[in-house]
Amino acid sequence: MLDIKYLRKNVAEATRRLQDRGIESEKLTTLLSLDKARREAIQQVESLKAQRNEVSDKIAYAKRNKTDASEAILAMQEVGSKIKALDARQASLDMEVKNLAAHLPNLAASDVPVGPDEAANVEQRVWEPKTYGQRLKAHQEAPEWLKAHYEVGETLGILDFERGAKVSGARFLYYVGDGARLERAVYNFMLDEHRQEGYTEMITPIVVNDAAMFGTGQYPKFQDDAYRVEGLEQTYIPTAEVPLTNYYSGETLPAEDLPIKFTALSPSFRKEAGAAGKDTRGLIRLHQFNKVEMVKFTKPEQSYEELESMTANAENILQKLGLPYHVIMLSTGDMGFSAAKTYDVEVWMPQQQVYREISSVSNTEDFQARRMHITYRNEAGQLALVHTLNGSGLAVGRTVAAILENYQNPDGSVTVPEVLRPYLGGQDKLMATPHH
C-alpha cells in the first residue's frame, strides 16, 4: 500500500511515477478526490459531535432548572441523524479509498529502468563456471545429441509427466527414483547454504487467510491466479513469501534484531491463468512446484544493501552448482506489483538456447509492511515501518531442469554436480533405471 500522505503532498511526482508503472493519472485523481471527501466528512462529523455535546449540556441545564428542553431535544435529534448519515458516507468513502489504493502498485526506485515491458530490462552481469567449456559452452550452437530437460528426465525414467496428467491434469508430474532424490538433494543443499548465510529456517503453513494474501500484495489484484479453498476465505500459497512475511503482521520488531532473515521450502500453487500455450512441457511452468524462499525484515536505510546481498545469496547457489546465469534489473513495466526494485536471476538452458528465470529478488520497501502493519522503533524512538524483501533461493524444479540440460552427456546420462553428491550418497551420475 502506498503512503496516502505522500500522494497528497506530491501529486505531480506520484502521477509520473505511477504512469511509469502503467497506471493512468485518472486513478490517482479519483483516489485523491475521494480521500478529500472522506477527510471533509470526518471534519463535519467532529464538528457535529461538538455541537451535539453543546446541545446535550443545554438539555441537562434545562432539566436541572425544570425549564422547557423540547427545542434542544429536537435539535439534538437532528444533529444525531446528520451524524448517522455522515458516518455512513464516511464508511462508504473509506471502503472506496481503501479499494482504489489496494489496486495501486508500488512506486519504482529511482534507478529502475523505465519501460513498458521486459524489453526495457537491463542486464547487470553474466556468470559462467570456468569448467563449463569442457562440457558445453553457453551460447554456442547446441549439439544434435543435446535434449530438452523433460526428454532427458523421461528417457532416464525419473520424470513422469504422463501419469501426472492422468492423476491431476496438465502441468503436474511425478518425480520418480533418482528424480525424487535429485529434487530432495537440491532443496536440502539450498536450505543448508542459506542457513550458513544467517537465515533462520522455517516450515510454514501452506494455507493462508485472505488478510495474509492482501498483506504481501497478491490480493486483491491476482485473485484469479490463486488456488482457493472452497467455502473458506483461505488460499493455497503461491510462494512461501506469503506466510514468511506475514509471520510478523501487526507486530513491532526490536530495532536491535534487524535485519531478520527467514528461509523456507514449500510447495507453491499457481493456476498460471495467463500462460496458456507457454512452456506446456517440462518443469518450467507447473501448477504445483517446490521453491526455497528467502525473506528479510530490515531498517529502511539497510534495505538496498540487503537487496544486493540477497541477490548474491541466490547467485551463490547457481555458482556452487556450476550453472551459467545472468542477472537483470527489471523495468518499471516488468516488475511485480509490490516491488520497488527487482533483480531476476536467469539460468542458461542450452537446448533452448535461452536464459530462464530461476529467481526473482525484490525490495518492496515499506509497501508490504504498511499493508501488514509491521513496525519497529527508530533511533528517535518513533514507530516506523520496516522494509521487507523477498527472493527465490531458488525455484527447485527449474534448478533440476537446468541441471538435467547443462550436465547431460552424449550417452544420455547426467553428471551430478559435485556439491550435490554428498546428498546423494556419493552418486556421481544419473543413469536410466527401470521402474514400473
From Swiss-Prot:
Pathway linked to the protein? Aminoacyl-tRNA biosynthesis; selenocysteinyl-tRNA(Sec) biosynthesis; L-seryl-tRNA(Sec) from L-serine and tRNA(Sec): step 1/1
- Which GO terms of type biological process are on file? selenocysteine biosynthetic process; seryl-tRNA aminoacylation
Ligand binding (L-serine): 239-241, 293, 392
Cellular compartment(s): Cytoplasm
Positions contributing to ATP binding: 270-272, 357-360
Task: Name the reaction it catalyses.
Answer: tRNA(Ser) + L-serine + ATP = L-seryl-tRNA(Ser) + AMP + diphosphate + H(+); tRNA(Sec) + L-serine + ATP = L-seryl-tRNA(Sec) + AMP + diphosphate + H(+)
- What GO terms are given for molecular function? ATP binding; catalytic activity, acting on a protein; serine-tRNA ligase activity; transferase activity
Gene Ontology CC: cytoplasm
Give the keywords, sorted: Aminoacyl-tRNA synthetase, ATP-binding, Cytoplasm, Ligase, Nucleotide-binding, Protein biosynthesis
- What broad class of enzyme is this? ligase
- The catalytic activity of this protein is classed by the Enzyme Commission as 6.1.1.11
Q: Has the keyword NAD been applied to this entry?
A: no
Presence of the UniProt keyword Nucleotidyltransferase in the record: no
Query: Where's it mainly located?
Result: cytoplasm
Q: Give the domain section of the comments.
A: Consists of two distinct domains, a catalytic core and a N-terminal extension that is involved in tRNA binding.
The similarity annotation says: Belongs to the class-II aminoacyl-tRNA synthetase family. Type-1 seryl-tRNA synthetase subfamily.
Described by its record, this protein's role is as follows: Catalyzes the attachment of serine to tRNA(Ser). Is also able to aminoacylate tRNA(Sec) with serine, to form the misacylated tRNA L-seryl-tRNA(Sec), which will be further converted into selenocysteinyl-tRNA(Sec).
Describe the subunit structure. Answer: Homodimer. The tRNA molecule binds across the dimer.
Q: Spell out the protein name for this chain.
A: Serine--tRNA ligase
Q: What is the lineage of its organism?
A: Bacteria, Bacillati, Bacillota, Bacilli, Lactobacillales
What gene is this protein translated from?
A: serS
